């Protein structure tokens, strides 16, 4: 059968939360839920993860931070597994220009590049970082500088949460922007 895995998190976005994985070894007929991090303070909880499979049992995940403080603790989380999701490491990255904004990863197995898309809330900038997967795997502080892709709304809660996908050799990103109640979905293709 096909092995399937998905990450989960649970929180009320107030004080604490947990995260983990659900797995299936029978093509999704049955699932097993496992907690990896439990009762973590909200500032230490990786939420809304985006994962890519790098091959050879390696899974790379970037997750958002709920920490709004302008400190080194306000950075995206990098979760990694080298054994098909059995065990995990969790560390903060050097990506601190972001909070409460869902990331989106794309992995290009032909080039070995991983693309980390995210929206910088408050400043209103859609950003992307490009790294060789081998350079950041095991090295969460090694992400290169970001590139600004597009500008959007600056109200922190009315703009953000990018989703990106690779299509026909291009990357297409979608995010919401505006000022409530006048928000819209925007796209960029690179």
Stretch-by-stretch model annotation:
Residues 1-190:
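Asp-box/BNR beta-propeller blade signature and adjacent active/binding-site loops
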């Amino acid at each position: 059968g096909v092995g399937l895995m998905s990450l989960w998190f649970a929180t009320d976005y107030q004080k604490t939360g947990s995260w983990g994985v659900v797995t299936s070894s029978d093509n999704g007929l049955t699932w097993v839920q496992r907690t990896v991090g439990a009762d973590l303070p909200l500032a230490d909880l990786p939420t809304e993860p985006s994962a890519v499979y790098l091959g050879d049992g390696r899974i790379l995940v970037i997750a958002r931070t709920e920490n709004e403080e302008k400190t080194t603790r306000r950075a995206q989380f990098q979760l990694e597994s080298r054994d098909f999701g059995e065990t995990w490491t969790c560390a903060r990255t050097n990506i601190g220009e972001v909070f409460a904004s869902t990331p989106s990863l794309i992995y290009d197995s032909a080039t070995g590049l991983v693309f980390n898309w995210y929206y910088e809330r408050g400043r209103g900038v859609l950003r992307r970082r490009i790294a060789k997967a081998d350079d950041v795997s095991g090295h969460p502080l090694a992400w290169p500088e970001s590139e600004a892709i597009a500008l959007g709304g600056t109200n922190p809660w009315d703009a953000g949460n990018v989703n990106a996908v690779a299509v026909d050799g291009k990357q297409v990103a979608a995010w919401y922007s505006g000022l409530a109640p006048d928000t819209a979905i925007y796209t960029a293709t690179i």
